[in-house]
Regions:
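Short, contiguous alpha-helical
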Residues: 2-47, 83-146
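Intrinsically disordered, low-complexity segments enriched in polar/charged residues with Gly/Pro
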Residues: 58, 72, 86-88
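A short, structured beta-strand-centered segment in the mid-to-C-terminal lobe
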Residues: 49-64
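Catalytic cores of extracellular degradative/oxidative enzymes
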Residues: 49-52, 70-84
């Protein structure tokens, strides 16, 4: 299977979805660290040319994860009620962080489902307990079940 293959019933490739899982928190971090406005275009940015295979995407994800850990250590005691501009209007830093978490989580659920359909067991899965409290739908996909 190629990462350029389209997902079932989606106009999106595996590569785009895998990248998007990490691009969402990257957009959040760019907003936090660089005061870059949280735009739809930033959040949905296409994978750069240098991301050619799953290892490249995993490395990108590791980079974002490390950035997040460092950011959180510096920011956890800061004012999360502060308002920030986004493509969907002004919102609190807390709301944007929560939205970042559930948005990426929803796509991870989709990836887990796709892998399950291919009879591939991920090394780690997100459990229902870990998702408790996140505003996620019961359904993994918007439309029909895949």
């Amino acid at each position: 299977m190629s990462l350029d293959n389209e997902l079932p019933n989606r106009p999106r490739s595996w590569k785009v979805l895998l990248h998007h899982v990490f691009q969402i928190p990257k957009a959040f971090l760019d907003n936090e660290e660089k005061s870059q406005e949280y735009t739809y275009e930033l959040m949905t940015e296409s994978p750069p040319e240098k991301l050619k295979n799953s290892s490249d995407i995993a490395n990108f994800g590791e980079e974002i994860s490390n950035r997040f850990i460092i950011w959180w250590k510096k920011s956890r005691d800061s004012d999360f009620s502060k308002q920030v501009p986004t493509y969907f209007g002004m919102t609190s830093r807390h709301e944007l962080l929560e939205r970042t978490v559930w948005h990426s989580t929803q796509h991870i659920r989709q990836l887990q489902s796709l892998l399950e359909n291919l009879e591939i067991k991920p090394g780690e899965i997100i459990s229902n307990e870990q998702m408790k409290g996140l505003p996620l739908t019961q359904e993994i996909w918007d439309e029909q079940k895949m």
